[in-house]
Amino acid sequence: MSQPPEHPGNPADPQGGNQGAGSYPPPGYGAPPPPPGYGPPPGTYLPPGYNAPPPPPGYGPPPGPPPPGYPTHLQSSGFSVGDAISWSWNRFTQNAVTLVVPVLAYAVALAAVIGATAGLVVALSDRATTAYTNTSGVSSESVDITMTPAAGIVMFLGYIALFALVLYMHAGILTGCLDIADGKPVTIATFFRPRNLGLVLVTGLLIVAVTFIGGLLCVIPGLIFGFVAQFAVAFAVDRSTSPIDSVKASIETVGSNIGGSVLSWLAQLTAVLVGELLCFVGMLIGIPVAALIHVYTYRKLSGGQVVEAVRPAPPVGWPPGPQLA
């Protein structure tokens, strides 16, 4: 009778296949790997030189902890205008005085610049008074003011001062709101120490120039550019980018989520308008809330992060247990 053929590399067992229990396989002979998802039986160990099978494809070791210094309290990068409003109001209530006082101070400074400029322009202009008497004998007067070269120079300088103050205020408020978004402690002085002020001034000049040119060609292009460049100053303050790169980054950010940008802009406008309806006193709340919405939108749409809103602390003490009858 013929014997079955022997497989190469698997010589016939000289002992008839009867091996003692617990003996190791011959040298060079690897034990068949266990089925996927199973390991060695409990209480056993692998012989020397025998490696455990690799994990199934598509699986790897469990992820380790984040590297030291990585912030674990940050939110995901998704954007929702509802979350923006909720987060901004929460952050405002946690920093109300710190936000309101700088806005009030900037408002007083703006009013002082406008009032001083207007007063000097009127004082340096030529005035001509003309008296009229109608057929009923009622007299009236009209005053014609003609601006002199000196008054024109004062008005020009006043516009420059007002523009610089607005940009300074914008950069200062953004600096404080960005620190709030990072979870850093802020004080009233934080809002008067804007970062990258030189980049902010040049970026603001670039935006105004392009918007003005677009307005001369047609009003709509200027408005569109002003809308897509709304985050340029935030990029300059937060990431120290050049004016041109700040504008480009803002255009890309708005273009990546036009719907979210529009809703955020409408939310900011609503906050300011509601403040105006409350006899302008409400703007002390509306402007900071709008700035926080702006910062939240900028961070989320540009791939940045913000700290989570502060949740109210749970009540002190153990919760009451079930009441027995």
Curated annotation (Swiss-Prot):
Residues annotated as transmembrane: 96-116, 153-173, 205-225, 273-293
Ranges of compositional bias, category Pro residues: 24-70
Highest taxon above the source species: Bacteria
Region described as Disordered: spans on this chain: 1-75
Membrane topology value: Multi-pass membrane protein
Location within or outside the cell: Cell membrane
Chief location: membrane
Name this protein carries in UniProt: Uncharacterized protein Rv2560
Provenance organism: Mycobacterium tuberculosis (strain ATCC 25618 / H37Rv)
